[in-house]
């Protein structure tokens, strides 16, 4: 796998992500502009060395928007699950990795990481929903090459509840433990926003650009 100096990154444009902020953060993390492909074209996804799926909004509408692009979901499955391309899902892009989400009804996700996305229910009344702002990242494993302890920026009302504890890579505290990152093999999903997390987020993205799982 190529490193960040030469690898192409497909940033999926499906009308449900803060593309400009994520694109700018990837460029600030070391990605060459000519290697960033903001795309809704499945063929470009298949040609890319790495894939980033952002997401802002509700689980159902994001999944619907992704499915509305002809052949996009099959292209993602081929690139990530078959070819093993490094994949990063951000916020709702991470939640879509689940089997299902419970926002505005029960809706099917990509099913790449077993689990479901459920409403945040803090056990401390001082912890408001949505969970918004800076919070500590606690690691459940010290061996994953992408993750470090530190502070990151969150904005969400629902959280990923993984079925397999081995896929839970990091948590944060918001009236109880909340999933901050999930992953397996070449797949990484983060609930926090790297593009809003200043140096912590840029360093995380830089490691993703060099990641060769």
UniProtKB/Swiss-Prot annotation:
InterPro entries: Class_I_gatase-like, GATASE, Imidazole-glycPsynth_HisH. One of its GO terms (cellular component) is cytoplasm. Its main location: cytoplasm. HAMAP family: HisH. SUPFAM superfamilies: Class I glutamine amidotransferase-like. PROSITE patterns: GATASE_TYPE_1 (PS51273). Residues 8-213 form the Glutamine amidotransferase type-1 domain. Pathway: Amino-acid biosynthesis; L-histidine biosynthesis; L-histidine from 5-phospho-alpha-D-ribose 1-diphosphate: step 5/9. Pfam families: GATase (PF00117). This is Imidazole glycerol phosphate synthase subunit HisH. Keywords: Amino-acid biosynthesis, Cytoplasm, Glutamine amidotransferase, Histidine biosynthesis, Hydrolase, Lyase. IGPS catalyzes the conversion of PRFAR and glutamine to IGP, AICAR and glutamate. The HisH subunit catalyzes the hydrolysis of glutamine to glutamate and ammonia as part of the synthesis of IGP and AICAR. The resulting ammonia molecule is channeled to the active site of HisF. Its EC number is 4.3.2.10, 3.5.1.2. The lineage of its organism: Bacteria, Pseudomonadati, Pseudomonadota, Alphaproteobacteria, Sphingomonadales. It is found in: Cytoplasm. Heterodimer of HisH and HisF. One of its GO terms (biological process) is L-histidine biosynthetic process. It catalyses: 5-[(5-phospho-1-deoxy-D-ribulos-1-ylimino)methylamino]-1-(5-phospho-beta-D-ribosyl)imidazole-4-carboxamide + L-glutamine = D-erythro-1-(imidazol-4-yl)glycerol 3-phosphate + 5-amino-1-(5-phospho-beta-D-ribosyl)imidazole-4-carboxamide + L-glutamate + H(+); L-glutamine + H2O = L-glutamate + NH4(+). GO terms for molecular function: glutaminase activity; imidazoleglycerol-phosphate synthase activity; lyase activity.
